[in-house]
């Protein structure tokens, strides 16, 4: 029997000796490689966090002591140790195990975290709550995988350091997020060892000098300042101590005994402590260790022996189309520069970086800084293209509004993973951008439907000089091009019902990548003898006035988008028609305003009613209801014009 098969809770880990822990670590790695190879997921980060996680669960008592995972994709080992090993066969699948911590799965999970740099703020609040409630509970926050490049971490550290609350911060220093971590902070993380005896002596000296009138406190400050100055000259690792945090490390994060010893010292101290663990992403799996790009940060279905994809990728992705096009644009325009927040490879900038290494800027996990820095680049005469996941632009709304739009800077935002992302779950769905960006004055939004329109609209966006632009598209493969059969103003007409159908009953406004779905819907609706026209506005902010004329020629307008309904494009179409005094009803179909669980994109869309068959049924029902209402109005009008029975002139 394997050791791993006997582990169902953290208590089972506590009974093991050193040799058994080493064996268990190896078994966990083997399990991870084979499990994630079957389903896909974040492999590299978790291979690097095995011993670290074992040590945490040996030293602390979860769930009484709370363990928080920043960049929650590094929590797989934690899930294994807390009784979820048997669920890994459905990792990131609908109804299966989440790829991030989940309160619904386990009492050992408290924050459902995948947006980076937040765990320390949670830890600050939790530890304050426990202190006020008189509960002696430790809070352990595991940060790393690039999270410390986010400014929110440092805001939290500043507050945590000003207390004596029991917060243990484990810095999982693998030097990478998706790729090598960028910035001065990454260079600054190195060794500052803390001896308990030294701290005890320092406290005694402080107490003695503190009892000496007038000169005691200034003398201590002077001596302490000399010590700090010498330390900073000899080893440039003083930033944590300068904040007021005790520091243990660096520790070999792949030596479970060393990690356990460091964590016990940190726990015994009783106040806020940094434990600096040096780890390697992909550790123990040669295929991952040899992958210079991202150490198998996230993989699809692979061969566990070779690490190669099980099947060749079929079709072209939205990201790869963008990658090719931005290189072409960059070759023609030397003023075009690109920026990303620790996502160089995932957003498709690797080729641009290779072609123009001095024109790509990776600022780390710092979306707010990225947006305002881009505004500065534009002010300096360049044309910045900020490439970011749609969900992460949520974090920089104020900067988009005030620093870019208010200054009318021609910054282009390329939002990858817009709409429903699928397996990454609620925190990664990009279903809010077309709502919150609608309120930004002077900003234009393009939603391409296919590869051809992505190329065209990206070119249009980069060529715009009057304010910011956005180009948004989903994760995954691009469907075949859907060429326009006509154009009305700037609106593409994609479909008109056959002549046999009654015309001008439904105007179906398709938004972005929902075009294949809308064309499917149109065929189903037309088969019922209903006249339907499908159009793509291309730019969804501002909406083309041609939509008003098109709406006037139809009895019903239907909008379909992979964005939240509240404040989405459908709502804007309805407002456009109201403002133009066009009395045509609008039915808006979009994503439900709730956090959606992980699963394949098509399955999630079906759950919220955006599958073609469901949409077609609703459109047909809406047409029937509309016709019934119109017939009722006509009958009522006829009756009102009739002379009442027995009537006549008086």
Swiss-Prot record:
GO terms for molecular function: 1-deoxy-D-xylulose-5-phosphate synthase activity; magnesium ion binding; thiamine pyrophosphate binding. One of its GO terms (biological process) is thiamine biosynthetic process. Binds 1 Mg(2+) ion per subunit. Binds 1 thiamine pyrophosphate per subunit. It catalyses: D-glyceraldehyde 3-phosphate + pyruvate + H(+) = 1-deoxy-D-xylulose 5-phosphate + CO2. CDD domains: TPP_DXS, TPP_PYR_DXS_TK_like. HAMAP family: DXP_synth (MF_00315). Homodimer. This is 1-deoxy-D-xylulose-5-phosphate synthase. It comes from Parafrankia sp. (strain EAN1pec).
């Amino acid at each position: 029997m394997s050791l791993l098969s006997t582990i169902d809770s953290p208590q089972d880990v506590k009974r093991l000796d050193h040799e058994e822990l080493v064996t268990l670590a190896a078994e966990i790695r083997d399990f991870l490689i084979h499990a994630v190879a079957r389903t896909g997921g974040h492999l590299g980060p978790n291979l690097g966090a095995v011993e670290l996680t074992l040590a945490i669960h040996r030293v602390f008592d979860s769930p009484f002591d709370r363990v928080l995972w920043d960049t929650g994709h590094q929590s797989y080992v934690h899930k294994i140790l807390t009784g979820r090993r048997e669920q890994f066969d459905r990792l990131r699948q609908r109804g299966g195990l989440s790829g991030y911590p989940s309160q619904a799965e386990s009492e050992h999970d408290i924050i459902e975290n995948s947006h980076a740099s937040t765990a320390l703020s949670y830890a600050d609040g939790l530890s304050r709550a426990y202190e006020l409630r008189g509960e002696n509970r430790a809070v352990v926050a595991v940060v790393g995988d690039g999270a410390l490049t986010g400014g929110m971490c440092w805001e939290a550290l500043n507050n945590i350091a000003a207390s004596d609350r029991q917060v243990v911060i484990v810095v999982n220093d693998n030097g990478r997020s998706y790729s090598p971590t960028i910035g001065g902070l990454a260079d600054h993380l190195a060794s500052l060892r803390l001896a308990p005896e030294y701290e005890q002596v320092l406290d005694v000296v402080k107490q003695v000098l503190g009892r000496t009138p007038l000169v005691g406190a200034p003398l201590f400050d002077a001596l302490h300042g000399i010590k700090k100055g010498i330390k900073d000259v000899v080893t440039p690792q003083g930033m944590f101590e300068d904040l007021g945090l005790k520091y243990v490390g660096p520790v070999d994060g792949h030596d479970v005994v060393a990690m356990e010893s460091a964590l016990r010292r940190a726990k015994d101290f009783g106040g806020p402590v940094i434990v600096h663990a040096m780890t390697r992403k992909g550790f123990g799996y040669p295929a991952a260790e040899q992958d210079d790009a991202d150490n198998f940060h996230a993989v699809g279905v692979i061969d566990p022996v070779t690490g190669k994809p099980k099947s060749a990728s079929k079709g072209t992705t939205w990201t790869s189309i963008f990658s090719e096009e931005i290189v072409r644009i960059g070759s023609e325009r030397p003023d075009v520069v690109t920026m990303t927040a620790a996502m160089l490879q995932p957003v498709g900038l690797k080729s641009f970086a290779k072609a123009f290494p001095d024109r790509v800027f990776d600022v780390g996990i710092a979306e707010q800084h990225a947006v305002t820095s881009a505004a500065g680049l534009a002010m300096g005469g360049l044309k910045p293209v900020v490439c970011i996941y749609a969900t992460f632009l949520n974090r920089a709304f104020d900067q988009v509004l005030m620093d870019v739009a208010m200054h009318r800077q021609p910054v282009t935002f390329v939002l990858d993973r817009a709409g429903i992302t699928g397996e990454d779950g609620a925190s990664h769905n990009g279903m809010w951008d077309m709502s919150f960006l609608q309120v930004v004055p002077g900003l234009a939004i393009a939603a391409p439907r296919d590869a051809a329109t992505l190329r065209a609209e990206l070119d249009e966006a980069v060529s715009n000089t009057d304010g910011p632009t956005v180009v948004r598209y989903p994760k995954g493969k691009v469907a075949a091009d859907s060429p326009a059969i006509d154009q009305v103003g700037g609106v593409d007409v994609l479909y008109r019902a056959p002549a046999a159908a009654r015309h001008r009953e439904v105007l179906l406004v398709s938004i972005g990548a929902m075009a294949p779905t809308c064309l499917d819907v149109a065929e189903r609706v037309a088969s019922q003898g209903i006249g339907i026209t499908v159009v793509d506005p291309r730019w969804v902010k501002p909406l083309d006035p041609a939509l008003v004329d098109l709406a006037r020629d139809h009895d019903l307008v239907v909008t379909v988008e992979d964005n939240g309904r509240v404040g989405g494009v459908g709502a804007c179409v309805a407002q456009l028609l109201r403002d133009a005094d066009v009395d045509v009803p609008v039915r808006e179909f979009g994503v439900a305003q709730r956090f959606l669980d992980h699963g394949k994109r098509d399955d999630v869309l079906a759950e919220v009613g955006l599958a073609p068959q469901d949409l077609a049924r609703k459109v047909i029902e809406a047409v029937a209801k509309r016709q019934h209402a119109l017939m009722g109005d006509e009958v009522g009008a006829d009756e009102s014009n009739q002379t009442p029975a027995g009537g006549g002139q008086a």
